[in-house]
UniProtKB/Swiss-Prot annotation:
Pfam families: RCC1. Plays a role in transcriptional repression of satellite repeats, possibly by regulating H3K36 methylation levels in centromeric regions together with KDM8. Possibly together with KDM8, is involved in proper mitotic spindle organization and chromosome segregation. Plays a role in regulating alpha-tubulin deacetylation and cytoskeletal microtubule stability, thereby promoting cell migration and TGF-beta-induced epithelial to mesenchymal transition (EMT), potentially through the inhibition of KDM8. This is RCC1 domain-containing protein 1. Its main location: nucleus.
Length: 377
């Protein structure tokens, strides 16, 4: 009989509100992965900017950071600054989606509730004993609607889309359908929609640049997007201000404090950088990539999972390595410093300890990873 391998969750990056991240000894940032100072049976993590929601295998959700609180019967969770969304068992086979104000600490009444059809399940919800899982929220289990942080909180989706995965960026939406096609809509002024322009889209629009390629995963950052093909290729597009696309960036060579504090460019600044990049002389940096670009990892590694923070990107390879790049001011890249990177770099912490990374999920300014001991056989 094979020896049971042990796994654990790790965290690194911003923890200025006391959210569960590493050992809990840091007042502001964690620059290298540390085991979570939390329950041993955590199976899911969802992080907002100022707080984190942890779900145990027994279905208990626990909040840490700027808000606290706990509740039982949780099957899935999605955390944002505006809204905390839970998928909860309500007795028997009854299930409901609850949208809470994060500061309510899960006390009183939720802002919004929707009862689900009996037996409706999201991907991974029928395996509560798994050591780690990725929920489907903000996509509802029926796959015909999704939750948004603003009223009316629930937006319908056309049934013909046959949605497999849906991710929300700061101003845009990515959708992966059952046929492996990717759709996007929302604001586009940072190129995050991938249609080759900076125009907004009000309805789901097919990414024509990826037609003929079957995609397996999508991930939405603040203003950038990633998708992974079924064969492990990475396609990436959108805003590259901090190198989150792994393309040459001005902020990688300039040391300007105001750029580290910025959260987005205004339209004038955006046009100015585009003009420089499009000038006759060869551009030394790329501010915006408005359509999908193929990205190769070192050693030609295949990618099986991706997650994006506000301005950083994390990818797990088929062989269990973690690569991160982009904005690193709070240690969210896990490379023991606050350096931002415009190229994928392996997080050596897990390699040095013979740990195989199985899952990654990014908060806006931090990163959570599930890893387990490598098979020694």
């Amino acid at each position: 009989m094979a020896e049971k391998r042990h796994g654990a969750w790790f965290g690194f990056g911003f923890c200025g509100f006391g959210q569960a991240l590493g050992s809990g000894n840091s007042h502001h940032s964690v620059y290298s992965p540390e085991p979570l100072h939390a329950s041993d049976d955590i199976c899911q993590v969802s992080a907002g900017w100022s707080y984190t929601a942890l779900v145990t295998r027994g279905g208990r959700v626990e909040l840490s950071g700027s808000v606290s609180g706990a509740a039982d019967g949780c099957r899935d969770v999605w955390a944002s600054e505006e809204l905390l969304v839970l998928l909860r068992n309500k007795g028997g086979s009854s299930t409901e989606v609850q949208a809470w104000v994060p500061g309510s600490a899960l006390q009183g009444e939720p802002l919004w509730v929707q009862n689900l059809v009996s037996g409706a399940k999201g991907q991974g919800e029928d395996e509560p004993s798994r050591e780690s899982r990725m929920g489907t929220l903000p996509l509802l289990p029926c796959a015909r609607a999704y939750v948004t942080p603003e009223p009316p909180f629930c937006q319908p989706l056309a049934p013909e889309l046959r949605v497999r995965q849906l991710e929300l960026g700061a101003e845009h939406v990515l959708l992966l359908c059952a046929a492996g096609q990717v759709f996007s809509w929302g604001a586009g002024r940072h190129g995050q929609l991938g249609h080759g322009t900076l125009e907004a889209e009000l309805e789901p629009r097919l990414l024509e640049a990826l037609q003929g390629l079957r995609m397996a995963k999508v991930a939405a950052g603040g203003w950038h997007s990633v998708c992974l093909s079924e064969t492990g290729d990475i396609y990436i597009w959108g805003w590259n201000e901090s190198g989150q696309l792994a393309l040459p960036t001005r902020s990688g060579t300039e040391n300007k404090a105001e750029r580290e504090e910025a959260t987005e460019l205004n339209e004038d600044g955006l046009k100015e950088e585009l003009a420089v990049a499009d000038a006759g002389a060869p551009a030394h940096f790329i501010a915006i990539q408005p359509f999908p670009a193929l990205l190769d990892l070192p050693l030609g590694s295949d990618a099986v999972m991706a997650s994006c923070g506000s301005r950083h990107t994390a990818v797990v390879t088929r062989t269990g390595e973690l690569y991160t790049w982009g904005w690193g001011k709070y240690g969210q890249l896990g490379h023991k410093d606050s350096t931002s990177l415009d190229r994928p770099c392996c997080v050596e912490y897990f390699v040095e300890r013979q740990l195989e990374v199985r899952a990654v999920t990014c908060g806006p300014w931090n990163t959570y990873v599930y890893a387990m001991e490598r098979d020694k056989s």
